[in-house]
From Swiss-Prot:
InterPro entries: AAA+_ATPase, ATP-synt_VA_C, ATP_synth_F1_bsu, ATPase_a/bsu_AS, ATPase_alpha/beta_chains, ATPase_F1/V1/A1_a/bsu_N, ATPase_F1/V1/A1_a/bsu_N_sf, ATPase_F1/V1/A1_a/bsu_nucl-bd. This is ATP synthase subunit beta, chloroplastic. It comes from Jasminum nudiflorum (Winter jasmine). It catalyses: ATP + H2O + 4 H(+)(in) = ADP + phosphate + 5 H(+)(out). Signal peptide: none annotated. Produces ATP from ADP in the presence of a proton gradient across the membrane. The catalytic sites are hosted primarily by the beta subunits. Keywords: ATP synthesis, ATP-binding, CF(1), Chloroplast, Hydrogen ion transport, Ion transport, Membrane, Nucleotide-binding, Plastid, Thylakoid, Translocase, Transport. Pfam families: ATP-synt_ab, ATP-synt_ab_N, ATP-synt_VA_C. GO terms for cellular component: chloroplast thylakoid membrane; mitochondrion; proton-transporting ATP synthase complex. GO terms for biological process: proton motive force-driven mitochondrial ATP synthesis. PANTHER family: ATP SYNTHASE, ATP SYNTHASE SUBUNIT BETA, MITOCHONDRIAL. It is found in: Plastid, Chloroplast thylakoid membrane. Its EC number is 7.1.2.2.
Length: 498
């Protein structure tokens, strides 16, 4: 760990001025810089252009070396807009890769790709920094034990459990509850696992980033009174930024998460929204650097770039990084190289359904479309596996019968099918759950449901012990005891009305 060479401070300027170059060409966000013979910077070194533009405005642009061109020239990609840069301007080689602040000082704050705070809450302690380019942990450091990462969310833990140190794809359109689900996971990991979260906003809308920040402050995930008690650090490289920033912002977020895992020995949740934008930015940079495009116009290094990022997300003997990545599927084509490359790395998928959201069932996780490699008897145990399979079979049968019900009505079904439908409707409602972060909007207190409680609840519904209870008793409750208590209250209310 060392001082970030790109941040200004006492004693840094003398270090910076050791190796100077000059801009010889500018094409959009790409700069060609010439250096004296024998003083070429290394690949991935950070270069800083400082000076004034034609109207006297100060310029401070950081770039990253991508190619050594020969003739003492390097090609670098800018991390911010290149407006005002001119040929002949002085370029400082910092002699090291981009480094960003890490540790407790990052919690509750918003950073850009360079690790500079952008929330106007004052400077951040930069005594502890870490370079954004690091190799993945060695095999000997990895924790190979397969273990479930309990989220306290019934539908996730039962039907598509997350792996500790795994990677989860989050699929869902606008307005189906993705943000609320993300905030609930951040809240639950802090309370149940004593962990922290890092949110990487990669190439998404600035408005969404701002909304997320405001909602986090409202729900207490970011503590405004005591910022150090916040549970999340935010790193944004949004749509309006140059491709260099969007390509590297994921690595900045990952570097912050790695420190919490390796040094603080914590369980960390890393959110990347959206992993497709990371690939898209890489494609833009690749074209600007003059590389021959591959299939569908993507960069030839697509698999390598994705692998470099994903392999750093893992469990070690110190702690774990569990990553949840929102995946945009262009034109709903799952065979597109970007989502297809992402799928190769995922351990589980959580699919959010607009149909369930329309019914008011939140979290709107589709129980039949969501999958997990962890749902195997040898990992989750025989009982969990059997109940998960029976829940899926019941819901699948209900789905098959829906056309018949719509045309002929429930009365035309056999006794067995009617029972299946009744249980499926109870299961569907019991998969909903009140969230802690939604208390502000709904007024009902949030519930964390342990895995054992979840299994017991669905076991009771499937066994038929609760067939006599009304289905609305299962809607938006925590464990099964709350459902039976709610049923008694409903019965008392109906008796009073009589």
């Amino acid at each position: 760990m060392r001082m970030n060479p790109t941040t200004s401070g006492s004693g840094v300027s003398t270090l910076e001025k050791k190796n100077l170059g000059r801009i010889v060409q500018i094409i959009g966000p790409v700069l060609d810089v010439s250096f004296p013979s024998g003083k070429m910077p290394n690949i991935y070194n950070a270069l800083v252009v400082q000076g004034r533009d034609t109207v006297g405005q100060a310029i401070n642009v950081t770039c990253e070396v991508q190619q050594l061109l020969g003739n003492n020239r390097v090609r670098a990609v800018a991390m911010s807009a290149t407006d005002g840069l001119m040929r002949g301007m002085e370029v400082i080689d910092t002699g090291a890769p981009l480094s960003v602040p890490v540790g407790g000082a990052t919690l509750g704050r918003i950073f850009n790709v360079l690790g500079e705070p952008v929330d106007e809450l004052g400077p951040v302690d930069t005594r502890t920094t870490s370079p954004i380019h690091r190799s993945a942990p060695a095999f000997i450091q990895l924790d190979t034990k397969l273990s479930i990462f309990e989220t306290g969310i019934k539908v996730v833990d039962l039907l598509a459990p997350y792996r500790r140190g795994g990677k989860i794809g989050l699929f869902g359109g606008a307005g189906v509850g993705k943000t609320v689900l993300i905030m609930e996971l951040i809240n639950n990991i802090a309370k149940a696992h004593g962990g922290v979260s890092v949110f990487g906003g990669v190439g998404e809308r600035t408005r969404e980033g701002n909304d997320l920040y405001m909602e986090m402050k409202e729900s207490g995930v970011i503590n405004e009174e005591n910022i150090a008690e916040s549970k999340v650090a935010l790193v944004y490289g949004q749509m309006n930024e140059p491709p260099g920033a969007r390509m590297r912002v994921g690595l900045t977020a990952l570097t912050m998460a790695e420190y919490f895992r390796d040094v603080n020995e914590q369980d960390v949740l890393l959110f990347i929204d959206n992993i497709f934008r990371f690939v898209q930015a890489g494609s833009e940079v690749s074209a600007l650097l003059g590389r021959m495009p591959s299939a569908v116009g993507y960069q030839p290094t697509l698999s390598t770039e994705m692998g470099t990022l994903q392999e750093r997300i893992t469990s070690t003997k110190e702690g774990s990084i569990t990553s949840i990545q929102a995946v945009y599927v262009p034109a709903d084509d799952l065979t597109d190289p970007a989502p297809a490359t992402t799928f190769a790395h995922l351990d589980a998928t959580t699919v959010l359904s607009r149909g369930l959201a329309a019914k008011g069932i939140y979290p709107a996780v589709d129980p039949l479309d969501s999958t997990s490699t962890m749902l195997q008897p040898r990992i989750v145990g025989e009982e969990h596996y059997k109940i998960a399979q029976r829940v899926k079979q019941t819901l699948q049968r209900y789905k098959e019968l829906q056309d018949i019900i719509a045309i002929l009505g429930l009365d035309e079904l056999s006794e067995e099918d009617r029972l299946t439908v009744a249980r499926a409707r109870k299961i569907e409602r019991f998969l909903s759950q009140p969230f802690f972060v939604a208390e502000v909007f709904t007024g009902s207190p949030g519930k964390y449901v342990g895995l054992a409680e979840t299994i017991r609840g669905f076991q009771l519904i499937l066994s038929g012990e609760l067939d006599g209870l009304p289905e609305q008793a299962f809607y938006l409750v925590g464990n099964i005891d709350e459902a039976t208590a709610k049923a008694m209250n409903l019965e008392m209310e109906s008796n009073l009305k009589k």
